[in-house]
Design a protein with these regions (language model features):
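Phosphate-handling DNA/RNA-contact segment within nucleic-acid enzymes
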Residues: 16-166
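Non-catalytic interaction/clamp surfaces of large macromolecular machines
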Residues: 1-6
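Phosphate/diphosphate-binding loops
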Residues: 171
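Active-site-proximal helix/loop microenvironment
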Residues: 13
């Protein structure tokens, strides 16, 4: 529904080479800023939109600050073969240090001291819509040590809890790589 799309920040990056580049330039952003943010790429004929013809989702930190975007391919003629793409690593966004949905799930994770880790953006959306408000996902990478640290900080509210959590997280890491 439209309300669900707003809740999750779903968007659409239209087809075309430079829709976003032209829009942001009109707002005073430089091409270098667009490149640095991972929103554009440098091609043989100039700067072009990285996300084109895709459904998009903002990837936020635990405070709700947008760090980057994830996007799903909609059209078969997409020049990027990958079904899903993310903002490339930037000064703000490092996929091995970000969990999609953490902004929506943080309060529930802290309160319930549990987390459900799923595969991707749409899985997080489906889980939240089904009432599983502790669902989060990695952003196109295996669940790693940095992700475990984020989860540990939310679940373990004391040093004993942190120690008790390390063992299960180590086991999880063995089966995610």
């Amino acid at each position: 529904s439209q309300a669900d799309c707003q809740r999750f920040g779903c968007g659409y990056a239209p087809q075309g080479w430079d829709n976003l580049v032209r829009y942001l330039a009109g707002k005073g952003f430089t091409q270098q800023e667009m490149l640095d943010a991972g929103l554009a790429r440098q091609g043989q004929h100039g700067v072009y939109d990285y996300f084109r013809g895709r459904v998009t989702w903002p990837i936020r930190d635990s405070t709700g600050r947008a760090l980057g975007f994830g996007a799903r391919k909609l059209y078969e003629d997409d020049s990027i073969g990958a079904k899903y793409i993310n903002t490339p690593d930037t000064a703000l966004y490092r996929k091995n240090q970000v969990l999609y949905g953490i902004d929506m799930a943080k309060a529930a994770i802290v309160k319930k001291r549990q987390v459900v880790i799923v595969e991707g953006y749409t899985d997080v959306m489906a889980m939240h819509l089904a009432g599983v408000d502790t669902a989060i996902a990695t952003c196109g990478t295996a669940f790693g040590a940095e992700h475990a640290k984020i989860v540990r900080r939310l679940i373990a509210d004391d040093s004993l809890g942190a120690v008790q959590l390390i063992g299960p997280l180590k086991v999880c890491l063995l089966y995610t790589s």
